[in-house]
Amino acid sequence: MQRKPVLGILGFSDGDPEVHEQLRGIVQAQVDAIVEALQADGRVDVVVAPELVNSVESAKRLSEDLARQGVDATLFSYGVFAFPNFSAIAAQNGKGPFLLAANLNPDWPGMVSMLAAGGALHHLGIEHFRVAGDVKKPEVLEQIVTFARCAKAVSSLNGMKYGLFGGRSLGMYSSTVSMQDWQKLFGIDVDHIDQSEIVREAELVPAEQVEKAYQWLTENVGSVQFNDTTFTPDKLRTQIRHYEAIKKLTKDNGYDFIGVKCHYEMSRHYCTECLSAAFMNDPYDWDGPKEPCALVRPTVTPL
């Protein structure tokens, strides 16, 4: 079962100790409203900082503490005017991406604080997102939930390993992965493996496993339409062997998701990898339930 996104929440207050004491209730009320709305909605787990940011020291300490707790992203909440440098320090030491949130309250300059903090982050080259409005409104809450879900997706990619069987297919630039960009943007390690490994491993698949799969397919799919040339029973058995080989190579190499070039080396001289694409992406095969593994072919970038 997939986990929920985890969103860290950090409230920002005035940097003057006396003013902070006067306004902390307003700032905390804004934080509490966001937390209560997310908890009632149930789609996002929250980790709330135990105190409000009102100094350089607390900005660094509290943002680092949220990051250590494994949040996918951090929401900065503004109920009154907070010194923008606090947000800059928190962003430099916390876990991004960052969502700046303020209510549209004419009595207090939370919106002004959010805009000033956003300007500070822009000056530092720190990309961020903003949401303005009452979190009790569905459209505002939905923006926060969507942000958290996207942040979880990006966070989950960090440290993953992509297995690239073969290289660019059919001359398509737009379907070719840049190893440097994926590592820089997502933290994904791209491991190149030759398609000949599929052929080698396919020859080692036991005949009884091939026949088991063949019988399962012919008995359970809606129709298997053989012909005398491109799709014979033996060709289906070859496709089964290739799927079993890809499944084993994926497990042995610790790949989280994969791509297979296929055209034209595999499709012309051995078989297409369509059956592999179908069952690697499914939560089952002839051996029963299994974890899906994203496979694209030809080697189209799956992101």
Q: Model regions: which residues?
A:
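An N-terminal assembly and electron-transfer interface module characteristic of large anaerobic redox
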Residues: 1-303
